[in-house]
Amino acid sequence: MTSATQFDNVSVVKRANVYFDGKCVSHTVLFPDGTRKTLGVILPCALNFGTDAAELMEVQAGKCRVKLDGSSEWQTYGAGESFSVPGKSRFDIEVLETLDYVCSYL
């Protein structure tokens, strides 16, 4: 996980990305080099996400359990930890404590 506490010289899309009846809300951040990230919050719940691109999920605060598509093992992540999700796949996430995250699209 990067040690930066803020992103400088970026554009932010004003409209929120709201998923699962408001259980997951994020905003898209656009970087000068064309890359993008989302900064978001997931409330305590169990969800199944699909990915287009590969993703790196960096947990800023909170706690979750994650099971990647094709795996039978759950992994637990907390603040300061991260996990990668392959593109064109799915993952289950069980949020145990409200999750503050940064998602990088790889």
UniProtKB/Swiss-Prot annotation:
The keyword Ligase does not apply. Gene3D superfamilies: Jelly Rolls. Pfam families: Ppnp (PF06865). Keywords: Glycosyltransferase, Transferase. SUPFAM superfamilies: RmlC-like cupins. Signal peptide: none annotated. One of its GO terms (molecular function) is guanosine phosphorylase activity. Its EC number is 2.4.2.1, 2.4.2.2. It catalyses: a purine D-ribonucleoside + phosphate = a purine nucleobase + alpha-D-ribose 1-phosphate; adenosine + phosphate = alpha-D-ribose 1-phosphate + adenine; cytidine + phosphate = cytosine + alpha-D-ribose 1-phosphate; guanosine + phosphate = alpha-D-ribose 1-phosphate + guanine. One of its GO terms (cellular component) is cytosol. PANTHER family: PYRIMIDINE/PURINE NUCLEOSIDE PHOSPHORYLASE (PTHR36540), PYRIMIDINE_PURINE NUCLEOSIDE PHOSPHORYLASE (PTHR36540:SF1). Catalyzes the phosphorolysis of diverse nucleosides, yielding D-ribose 1-phosphate and the respective free bases. Can use uridine, adenosine, guanosine, cytidine, thymidine, inosine and xanthosine as substrates. Also catalyzes the reverse reactions. This is Pyrimidine/purine nucleoside phosphorylase. It comes from Burkholderia ambifaria (strain MC40-6). The gene is ppnP.
